[in-house]
C-alpha cells in the first residue's frame, strides 16, 4: 500500500499549520513555510517536529518554483 495523497487535503504542518506536499522520491512531506521535511515511514506520516529535518535553501527554492 502506498501513501494516500488524499491525506494532504486534511493534514497540515504541525509547526506553521500550512499545506504539505508529498515528495515521493524521498518519502517525505514537505512544508516550505516551516522549511521542514517530515518522514513518511511505512506509508504513515510522522508529523513530529523533532522527527523532521530542516530543508536547505536550495530545497525550499526547488519546492517553491
Swiss-Prot record:
Transmembrane segments: none annotated. It holds the Pfam family Trm112p. InterPro entries: Trm112-like. GO terms for cellular component: cytosol. SUPFAM superfamilies: Trm112p-like (SSF158997). It comes from the Bacteria. PANTHER family: PROTEIN PREY, MITOCHONDRIAL, ZGC:162634. Belongs to the UPF0434 family. This is UPF0434 protein PSHAa1659.
